[in-house]
Amino acid sequence: MVKLRDISTIAVSESTHNFEVFSGLEGVSDTVANLKSENVEINVLGHNPGSLNILIDASPHFRDEKALSDCFGPQMGGVVYDSYDRMVMKNGRIENYPDTEIPTLDVTPLNVDRSLTPKQKENRNKCKKLFDHLLLEIQRGKITAGCVDDYFAFMHAAYCVLSKVYLPRFKYKHFEISSRLVTIHECNNNTKPSLFWSNRDDESHDYMTIIQMMVQVFSNAMTKYATSHLINEYHNDLDSPTSDILTKVVDELKDIDIEPATYATIVYLWLTGEDEIEDLDVLAVIFDECRSDGFVDNLLVRMLPPCEGASLTSEAIDTGLLYTRNDGYMVYTASMVEEDVNKMEYDRRYGLPLMEFRATNSLVTLRVDYTTKTNKQMKVQLMINKFPKFELMNTDIFSSQYLMLGKNIVIDMIKMTGHMLRGNVQSANLDTQRKLSNLVSSSHPWITRLVANRARDDVHIRFASHMITDLDNLTKREHPKTIFVESLKMLDHFGKSERYELLVYLSAADF
């Protein structure tokens, strides 16, 4: 879990663009008009991890244009050098950029519409200004290499949720969405997604392309949420100066908790939504304590995969609400319950969780049950009067889908850990283990439940357990990378090509 301030820059600008969608709303039109007359708005600008990585790597050479060109090429090296030069460093102080709590930047989130058509030219100058601000934060020590490594690990966890849980739905015809998204889910299979094709240097950038898309869509969604929050505060407090209201709203935004599954869900909701106001009502369910039952229903239903002809049922329970969709082969359940519920009991009743995140004292979970039986199987069971009992500790009953997920988590955990420890092995400690465990709990909660129940018969689950519970051993080894190499010897079910791929990754990783 991270704070919104850790993954984005929350700034104000002299503009009224963000208020346009709210102008016609009944009851707040006068408030919106008054705010527009103030000519000030809030923007949430998600950080591009690629840009942060470049700036961190370039930080020792900011004043050496030749060294920057040698490291990053003449074009990117020139961009970094020019950005540094604009800050006019004098006597170790940054004269032209006062260190204020709320930065003022003439920058809005990249203009990406619902069809995800990039409009790079009109935003190029704005991108440079945000680039300047990030470089400034690095110079002030507010963004460090450790922060960037943790952010990369976080974004990889969010990418895992989006690519494995949500994006596969776009290959079906249930969404009226641009064909640009149809092949994104195939990135893991080395096919070419068409998303932001013009922004890529070459075909190897599929992964970072999707990360870039996530950052842009998340920024759009959170900027609209920040605008609605500002309107509500201004509407309810007409006596306070606008500057005080701005400060209050920005401070509240900075402290919003974001988990990988939260991030991915917001991106998915914003991509598939048809009305921004309705989408904001759903976001309010995640971030605000006051919730409308109808908005909770909308959130849970939209989290379920859209299946034509599949039955949809709701169930009010003591601890919250859940929706179930049964397509005859699998049963998906989306629930919002009290945070202190017995998770294991829900897992036994509704299946293992695919993802999970907290929403203001509540727990939102998407589960899938692969144990649905066909009519023929049910008839056989009725004839012999024997019903198999689903035991969480018994991994033998898992379908091949779980073994596939087990292999995926091995690769995902290695990459998340590699991001966290890049060039900083000596700092690997229990805090690193805690961060990794939290990322996995949100993006792959089913594996942590199995580990907690000692379900380690499957080789992949044993490896994941090893990664989760024994990461502190990294601090006790002269060569921490060996813990991964030794663990790979357990993966008997991996093919030669998969084993080779992992070993190559480990050899190249800067542990």
UniProtKB/Swiss-Prot annotation:
GO cellular component, one term: host cell cytoplasm
Keyword Metal-binding: no
Cell compartment(s), UniProt: Host cell junction, Host plasmodesma; Host cytoplasm
Gene Ontology process terms (BP): transport of virus in host, cell to cell
Record keywords: Host cell junction, Host cytoplasm, Transport, Viral movement protein
Chief location category: host cell
Transmembrane segments: none
General function of this protein: Transports viral genome to neighboring plant cells directly through plasmosdesmata, without any budding. The movement protein allows efficient cell to cell propagation, by bypassing the host cell wall barrier.
Protein name listed in UniProt: Movement protein
Species whose genome carries this gene: Rice gall dwarf virus
Organism classification: Viruses, Riboviria, Orthornavirae, Duplornaviricota, Resentoviricetes
